[in-house]
UniProtKB/Swiss-Prot annotation:
GO terms for cellular component: acetyl-CoA carboxylase complex. Pfam families: ACCA. PROSITE patterns: COA_CT_CTER. Gene3D superfamilies: 2-enoyl-CoA Hydratase, Chain A, domain 1 (3.90.226.10). The lineage of its organism: Bacteria, Pseudomonadati, Campylobacterota, Epsilonproteobacteria, Campylobacterales. Residues 36-286 form the CoA carboxyltransferase C-terminal domain. This is Acetyl-coenzyme A carboxylase carboxyl transferase subunit alpha. It comes from Campylobacter concisus (strain 13826). Pathway: Lipid metabolism; malonyl-CoA biosynthesis; malonyl-CoA from acetyl-CoA: step 1/1. GO terms for biological process: fatty acid biosynthetic process; malonyl-CoA biosynthetic process. Keywords: ATP-binding, Cytoplasm, Fatty acid biosynthesis, Fatty acid metabolism, Lipid biosynthesis, Lipid metabolism, Nucleotide-binding, Transferase. It catalyses: N(6)-carboxybiotinyl-L-lysyl-[protein] + acetyl-CoA = N(6)-biotinyl-L-lysyl-[protein] + malonyl-CoA. GO terms for molecular function: acetyl-CoA carboxylase activity; ATP binding; carboxyl- or carbamoyltransferase activity. Its EC number is 2.1.3.15.
Length: 311
C-alpha cells in the first residue's frame, strides 16, 4: 500500500521491512515481521480519535461504491441517465443479485486518478444524478426489488449549472419520494456523508455507517472556518461536531454501525465488502417480514422523529 496516514507511520515502517525481507528471501524475518505488523495494527487502530476516523473515511485507498458493487453484486448491470438531461457519473445505479436476492444498488462514486476523479466530479452529484437515482428507485418499486444505497460524497455539487437545473429541488424531491417508496430500503455510509448530498440517498428503513465513516451537515474544515475563522482547526471541529459512526449511533441518528476489519476497509477491501453484504442480507430478511404499508409508515415515523425540539 502506497498511501499512509500520519498515525500509520509505524505500520509503514514494518511494511517496508517486510518488503525488504522478501527481497532478501528471508522467510523467517517475514514471518516475525508479519506477527509484529498484526500487533502494531491492533495497537494503532484500537483507539482512534474522531479526526483519525475522518482521515480514514477520506483515505484514497478506501473502497468506493463500485468496489463494493464489483465485490458482492452478481450479474450486475448498470443503468444510465435521468431521461431528462444527461447521465451523471457521480451516481452509479446497478441491478443484480446480493445473496441470491435481486437488488437495486445506487451509490455515490468519487473516482480514482485525476482523469476518473474529474469524470466522477470527485463524487459530487449534479441534480441529474439524484434524478437518475430516483428514476431507478422507482423501477425498484415497480418490480418489487429492495434498494441498497451506498453513500460517499463530500456534498452535492454547488456549481452554477447545478443550481440552475434545480439542485435543491432534486434533493428535496428525493427525500419526499424515498420516504414514501413502497419497497425495502437500506442505506450505508461507506466513506463521507456530506450534508444534503448524502441525505438525497439517505432516507431508508435502515441507515448504517461503516465503522470508519463520517456523516455531517458541513465539512470540519468549513465548520472551523465559520466558527473560528481558521480552517486549520478542523481537528477540533471534528471532535465537536459528533460525526463518527459511534457518535451518531449514540445520538440515535443511525440504526447500526458495521464493523470494518481491524486494519480498516482500505487495507482489507474484501473483508469490508463481506461485512457490508452480510449486513444487507440480514437486515433485508427482517424488513421483508413487514407489510409494505407498515414498512413505509415506520420509515416516515423514523424520519419525522429526527431532531430535538423546544416549544
Amino acid at each position: 500500500m502506497s498511501n499512509y496516514l500520519d498515525f500509520e507511520k509505524s505500520i509503514k515502517q514494518i511494511d517496508e521491512d517486510i518488503a525488504n525481507a522478501k527481497i532478501r528471501g528471508d522467510e523467517h524475518a517475514v514471518e516475525i515481521l508479519n506477527k509484529n505488523l498484526s500487533k502494531e495494527i491492533s495497537k494503532v487502530y484500537k483507539n482512534l480519535n474522531e479526526y483519525q476516523r475522518l482521515q480514514l473515511a477520506r483515505h484514497p485507498d478506501r473502497p468506493y461504491a463500485i468496489d463494493y458493487i464489483n465485490s458482492f453484486l452478481v450479474d450486475g448491470y448498470e443503468v444510465h441517465g435521468d431521461r431528462a438531461f444527461r447521465d451523471d457519473p457521480a451516481i452509479v445505479c446497478y441491478i443484480g443479485y446480493i445473496g441470491g436476492k435481486k437488488t437495486v444498488v445506487i451509490g455515490e462514486q468519487k473516482g480514482r486518478g485525476t482523469k476518473n476523479k474529474l469524470k466522477r466530479n470527485f463524487g459530487m452529484p449534479h441534480p441529474e444524478g439524484y434524478r437518475k437515482a430516483l428514476r431507478v428507485a422507482k423501477l425498484a418499486e415497480k418490480f418489487n426489488l429492495p434498494i441498497l444505497f451506498l453513500i460517499d460524497t463530500p456534498g452535492a455539487y454547488p456549481g452554477v449549472g447545478a443550481e440552475e437545473r434545480g439542485q435543491s429541488e432534486a434533493i428535496a424531491r428525493n427525500l419526499f419520494e424515498f420516504a414514501n417508496l413502497k419497497t425495502p430500503i437500506i442505506a450505508v455510509v461507506i466513506g463521507e456523508g456530506g450534508s444534503g448530498g448524502a441525505l438525497a440517498i439517505g432516507v431508508a428503513d435502515r441507515l448504517a455507517m461503516m465503522k470508519n465513516s463520517v456523516f455531517s451537515v458541513i465539512s470540519p474544515e468549513g465548520c472551523a472556518a465559520i466558527l473560528w475563522n481558521d480552517p486549520t482547526k478542523q481537528e477540533q471541529a471534528t471532535k465537536s461536531m459528533k460525526i463518527t459512526a459511534d457518535d451518531l449511533k449514540n445520538l440515535s441518528l443511525i440504526d447500526d454501525v458495521i464493523n470494518e476489519p481491524i486494519n480498516g476497509a482500505h487495507r482489507d477491501k474484501d473483508g469490508a465488502a463481506k461485512a457490508l453484504a452480510n449486513y444487507f442480507i440480514s437486515e433485508l430478511a427482517e424488513l421483508e417480514k413487514l407489510d409494505i404499508n407498515e414498512l413505509v409508515a415506520k420509515r416516515i415515523d423514523k424520519v419525522l422523529s429526527i431532531g430535538a425540539y423546544e416549544e
